[in-house]
């Protein structure tokens, strides 16, 4: 595989990840969001090079998370230009996490080839998501692949059984099987057919369960939740003369929310 092909797959992985999440609404991307990573891992398995696996994984995480988290700089730049440094540190760390995942998955394929990638990848990548969600001040617990399917409510209803992590494992499993089906369609039609059928069957089952839940689940009002956002400027927050005005504004808005309930 040439460097250009690796760069293309890394870039494609970043684009798929970006468009899989809101505000974009392309649910089908959630099922192939890790396809570029799967293609890279298949190549790494054939090479048996764990050092190269970490390198490719680092670039994959660095670029993809750099694209997805672009808003960090946009949102925080007016507070301090140091937000650019924080953004860089964050995506470098994400690259290290992803590099570790590529290294481990390649190592597992080398030492335990009888365990298929559609088993190891969902488990290891979900561990990565858990680590990213518990990374201190730069934690992103909402960045799981399962959260990308929220634009297809009928397909995520079974999260009441497996949670967002369960949805994520399913989507990762689909990515692996779809890539393997595409690779085996020439010469191994039966193998490709059962992989494609397995994905379609799980989507159909998810749809059926979701449709049932959405039509039979009884809803009742439990209360009113109000969000108060006074839009106080960054520099105003540190001005002692503005303290009382800010408190009065918060109290006024809170009373308005309470009156609405």
Question: Predicted regions: what is each one?
Answer:
Residues 210-261:
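Soluble catalytic regions of membrane-associated enzymes that act on cell-envelope
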Residues 1-216, 247-251, 255:
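Membrane-embedded alpha-helical bundles of multi-pass enzymes
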